[in-house]
Amino acid sequence: MRRYEVNIVLNPNLDQSQLALEKEIIQRALENYGARVEKVEELGLRRLAYPIAKDPQGYFLWYQVEMPEDRVNDLARELRIRDNVRRVMVVKSQEPFLANA
């Protein structure tokens, strides 16, 4: 198991119920691929450096997870096929991973 950071940019035009549904689907996908979520941060609506799908903004989510190495690409692929997911980036965590005591 390795530690990863999962960065996701969602469609900025989602209402609260759609946003909650997308977060639930993302959480389920992480669990289905054997990820143990350690930390979640909702960075909210942010301006993008360049428009994605003609939107100058995106709703940002950041997850810190521990998961099997061989499942990372499958997870990223599943998240990318969602219509409301604009971008997905999964990177190995650089900082020491400390569990809450």
UniProtKB/Swiss-Prot annotation:
Keywords recorded for this protein, A-Z: Ribonucleoprotein, Ribosomal protein, RNA-binding, rRNA-binding
Leader peptide range in chain numbering: none
GO terms under biological process: translation
InterPro entries: Ribosomal_bS6, Ribosomal_bS6_CS, Ribosomal_bS6_sf, Ribosomal_S6_plastid/chlpt, Transl_elong_EF1B/ribsomal_bS6
Gene3D superfamilies: 3.30.70.60
GO CC annotation terms, alphabetical: cytoplasm; ribonucleoprotein complex; ribosome
Oligomer and partners: Part of the 30S ribosomal subunit. Forms a tight heterodimer with protein bS18.
Family according to the record: Belongs to the bacterial ribosomal protein bS6 family.
Function: Located on the outer edge of the platform on the body of the 30S subunit.
Official protein name in the record: Small ribosomal subunit protein bS6
Organism: Thermus thermophilus (strain ATCC BAA-163 / DSM 7039 / HB27)
Taxonomic placement: Bacteria, Thermotogati, Deinococcota, Deinococci, Thermales
Name of the gene encoding the protein in the UniProt record: rpsF
